[in-house]
Amino acid sequence: QEVFSVKEDQYKKEGCSFRVAATGQKLFTAGVHTASGDVGRGVMANIDDAYAASNPNALALAWDSAHSNVHNLIGEDLKAKPSSAGNGSFDNFLVYWDGDLGRELLDANIIQKYFASTGTTKRFYGPSDGYTLTGASPNNYTKRTPSLVADIWGDWREEIIMPVNKASSTEQAYLRI
């Protein structure tokens, strides 16, 4: 078993690493840490079925918020990491959305698919394409995360639960947690 982790310690001088869980042996370390000292977030997953088919022993790809490229399982830079014009990069969350074996990228209320061979993305949902998760907002401004991502219906794809911008009810609740 292996472990992928993002480092937030500016003195470790590594943005993310991939290690053997039992021994701690490094399989790769991605780059030198940024001057700001905050990598903050990162992901690793099979996000491109075509890449996985041509690299069956190394199907996962990884990236973090401090570096500009996607890395394979031995730490080689492949292409530019996924980004969304005006919305930052997709370092937060992954979701099984379109029914294939690869995960899609989720940031705030935008869902995209990444293609490792070209370093490009295809947007499924987002503010600029008319297919928005209407009225949905992420939980916080900096991390832009949903409340829950899970396969609730058991159909392989995952559902996304987010707060709505304007919530109302005909029954007022006075108790708060």
Predicted feature locations:
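Blade-level signature of beta-propeller repeat domains, shared across WD40, Kelch, NHL, RCC1
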Residues: 151-177
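Exposed, low-structure sequence patches enriched in small/polar residues
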Residues: 35, 43-48, 63-65, 69-96, ...
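Structural motif
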Residues: 11-17, 65-74, 109-117, 168-177
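Acidic/hydrophobic-patterned starts of short beta strands in beta-sheet-rich repeat architectures
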Residues: 1-7, 51-63, 96-109, 154-163
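Repeat-based blade/solenoid architectures
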Residues: 12, 32-45, 83-98, 130-148
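Calcium-coordinating acidic loop motifs
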Residues: 22, 47-48, 97, 151-153
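Blade-edge motifs of beta-propeller repeat domains
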Residues: 20-34, 76-86, 117-141
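Catalytic cores of extracellular degradative/oxidative enzymes
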Residues: 1-77
